[in-house]
Amino acid sequence: MKKALVATLSISILGLMIVSPALAAPSQNFFERGDEVYDSFGICRSRSIGEDGFMQLTEHGFDPIIARESLGENIDVAWELGQTFAKEYPEPHQRAQQIFYFVRDRVVYTSDIDEFGHEEFAQNADELAGAVLENGAAPGDCEDDAILLAVLYKAAGFRSAIVLAPDHAAALVHLPDYNKAARGLTLEGEAGWVWAEATGRTNALGWFAPSFVGKPMFARELSEEAMPEKELTYRLTPVQRASSGGGFSFGGISPFFSVVFMLWLFSSMRRRPAKRRRK
């Protein structure tokens, strides 16, 4: 049964490429302004910080505005792909896992400097999904994985979010009754969020890096409109697995991004001490 579903999904994905081959081509609407690269939406792809940075990371928080290039009136190949998963996998847990495996197995971790010649360069969900559909696999780093996963999950009928941790980015999917996650995650008191870390080639959906324990993290739920930033908290669950079963890659976020991010976290901790003490 599983093989039949995978075969059916493969045929459906191939259909996306045949019916609309242009969808498989990454956007070429880029222009340079000084040393920085911008897209047609006015978002800087080679910088995560600032009001026009792809993560809109400032001292006040962050907002992954690049994800909205693939939502609402801008839906394209990534949204269609997510809906294909929804049709082929009606059971929510299996659907969430198959979306995760698709990104984990087909996006090959590659640093931005090696692939694009920039310390940072973000791809939107349509560009990365299109490249995967066209070539069978495509290069990307942690924020590329997170953006694609979050858009696919939302298109497939889930609530999803992008989370920033020190030196890293990942996706979250809301699966309240999923019992295979290593840790139970909560966003501002709402439980049921599952960590989706796709840069490790052996990771399972819900695997959580032990090195993140005790680290402050924040998330933004995906929406066509700006959503409030939420603090991510977590607890050990009875299904915690050995940490040797998975991994992740650092380097997807530039050293400068890391420094700014940590300054922002420290600033956030000073602004909201009561929330930091909650368990």
Language-model regions, residue ranges each:
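Hydrophobic/aromatic-rich core segments of domains that either
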Residues: 143-226
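Linear, non-domain "peripheral" regions
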Residues: 2, 18-80, 265, 269-276
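Secondary-structure boundary elements
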Residues: 55-137, 191
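Secretory targeting signatures
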Residues: 1-27, 171, 228-230, 239-279
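C-terminal membrane-proximal segments flanking the terminal transmembrane helix
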Residues: 130-131, 202, 276-277
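A short, highly charged nucleic-acid-interacting micro-segment common to nuclease
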Residues: 137-143
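Alpha-helical and coiled-coil interaction segments, frequently adjacent to or embedded
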Residues: 206-247, 251-252
